[in-house]
Regions:
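Metal-ion/cofactor- or nucleotide/acyl-coenzyme-handling active-site neighborhoods
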Residues: 1-237
Length: 237
């Protein structure tokens, strides 16, 4: 049996469409999530802890951090998550025995190079996720590579607060408290991932928009979530 999944069926599956990427910053609300019930959504990490608060379920889910998996793995495997579920097989270092689990190979070289040069190099990027997905200090980096591989034209991000200076750094509704202390420079490392996303997608056919309420991520055009959803609904009438 192969260690990694074959992702060929996902190539350009959503060509020209839009997606919403739900992250777990403190600005995330159930009201915002409920706006996205009819949208294509990616969610990550402790988003599974929202399932008892909403009928929304993601279209795709991803987890890449072994520490996060250690914290929520049992809940994840018992949850009613039934969408394609991407996970870093060599990062988490175990096979997840779920029928919808899709192990991918995380590529660490450029992440390591970026770290030892103190951010002076750009993080890697994979155009073919069958060959691996470039790793970064944030799981959103893997999500963006998958979304690009799938052919999405637009990606809207919510819950991307990128504020690591305050006492609250994760969503209360997602109920995730890291078991390890987050270093003070964590925000700088996460911003490296966002900067590399901007660089890699600059001349590609996928635009990123920030629909987060507040926060400190200013690398992408800001939009109001309800207006984006409302505009699309109006167009469909």
């Amino acid at each position: 049996m192969k260690k990694y999944a074959d992702f060929s069926s996902f190539k350009n599956k959503h060509i020209g469409q839009r997606c919403f990427i739900i992250l777990t910053g403190p600005s995330l609300t159930i009201d915002d999530i409920n706006l996205l019930k009819n949208e294509i959504t990616f969610s990550v990490n402790s988003c599974i802890r929202l399932f008892d608060k909403t009928s929304w379920r993601p279209t795709y889910y991803l987890i890449s951090d072994p520490l996060v998996y250690k914290s929520i793995g049992n809940e994840l495997e018992k949850s009613d998550l039934n969408c394609p579920f991407f996970y870093s097989r060599n990062g988490i270092k175990k096979k997840i025995n779920l029928s919808n689990a899709l192990p991918y190979k995380a590529l660490y070289f450029y992440h390591f190079l970026n770290f030892i040069t103190n951010g002076k190099t750009t993080l890697g990027w994979s155009l073919d996720i069958n060959k691996g997905i470039a790793d970064a200090p944030s799981c959103v980096y893997a999500v963006m590579q998958i979304a690009h591989y799938m052919g999405f034209k637009e990606a809207y991000v919510i819950g991307a607060d990128c504020n690591y200076s305050g006492p609250i750094q994760h969503s209360n509704i997602a109920s995730y408290q890291p078991k390890v202390k987050i270093p003070k420079n964590a925000g700088n490392h996460v911003l490296k991932a966002w900067r590399s996303i901007k660089i890699h997608l600059e001349n590609k056919n996928m635009k990123v928009y920030n629909a987060t309420r507040g926060g400190m991520l200013e690398l992408f055009p800001r939009v109001r979530l309800e207006e984006i959803v409302k505009e699309d609904q109006k167009w469909k009438l």
